[in-house]
């Protein structure tokens, strides 16, 4: 490998940023992400106006998070995922919520997975595997991640309510499945205990965040973490 190529590869790993625009007849989505945190922005917002009372937004020197999917509980979950993964993340979505929450939730999962994959770039110099546990009061969840380029998801949250806020509970595992498929990762998430479905869901997203944060962290080398010598 030439010296310029090496420098370019190191720069890409260092930045780990991406911007995704995904437009269909059902949803319009823009996502900006930095896996390393720090400052990000979307210059041309697709949102007609932003509310002043957003609860899925925060900005510090280390992270910028601003989530607007049109589905409040989905915003809350993506916010938790970004916060505890150490990402900076902006999500804007205009979806056909007059139908239901399916297209918006699924497409946000797909677009986030695409953004993650693009920001991650070559799986090199990272741990690849990550495991996370996270409690929320009585609820406890576990997540295991493999940056394998083998998309697969096993999700068992044991949710019993039909809705949490304005989000159908059936769409919560489907969001995670859509994310895993588009990100091309293997993902196992299960809630081990808990009786409050809000707590079960939130602990699952936080556990996933902990697992992803470990998986994308440096392993101290510039090697591909695979016996194949390649993950692509």
UniProtKB/Swiss-Prot annotation:
Gene3D superfamilies reported for this sequence: Imidazole glycerol phosphate dehydratase, domain 1 (3.30.230.40)
EC number: 4.2.1.19
Pathway assigned in UniProt: Amino-acid biosynthesis; L-histidine biosynthesis; L-histidine from 5-phospho-alpha-D-ribose 1-diphosphate: step 6/9
Enzyme class: lyase
Entry's Gene Ontology BP terms: L-histidine biosynthetic process
Catalytic activity: D-erythro-1-(imidazol-4-yl)glycerol 3-phosphate = 3-(imidazol-4-yl)-2-oxopropyl phosphate + H2O
A Pfam match: IGPD
Name of this chain's protein: Imidazoleglycerol-phosphate dehydratase
Lineage: Eukaryota, Fungi, Dikarya, Ascomycota, Saccharomycotina
């Amino acid at each position: 490998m030439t010296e310029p190529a090496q420098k370019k590869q190191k720069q890409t790993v260092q930045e780990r940023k991406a911007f995704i625009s995904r437009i269909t007849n059902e949803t319009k989505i823009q996502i900006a992400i930095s896996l390393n945190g720090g400052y990000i922005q979307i210059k041309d917002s697709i949102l007609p106006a932003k509310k002043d009372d957003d609860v899925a937004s925060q900005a510090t020197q280390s992270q910028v998070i601003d989530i607007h999917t049109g589905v409040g509980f989905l915003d809350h979950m993506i916010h938790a995922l970004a916060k505890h993964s150490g990402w900076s993340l902006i999500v804007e979505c205009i979806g056909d919520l007059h139908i239901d929450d399916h297209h918006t939730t699924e497409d946000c999962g797909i677009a986030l997975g695409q953004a993650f994959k693009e920001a991650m770039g070559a799986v090199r110099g990272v741990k690849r595997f990550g495991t996370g546990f996270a409690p929320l009061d009585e609820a406890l969840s576990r997540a295991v991640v493999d940056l394998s380029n083998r998309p697969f998801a096993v999700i068992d949250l044991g949710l019993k309510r039909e809705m949490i806020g304005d989000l159908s509970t059936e769409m919560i595992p489907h969001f995670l499945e859509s994310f895993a498929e588009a990100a091309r990762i293997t993902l196992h998430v299960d809630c081990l205990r808990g009786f409050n479905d809000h707590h079960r869901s939130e602990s699952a997203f936080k556990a996933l965040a902990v697992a992803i944060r470990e998986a994308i962290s440096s392993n101290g080398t510039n090697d591909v973490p695979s016996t194949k010598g390649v993950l692509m």
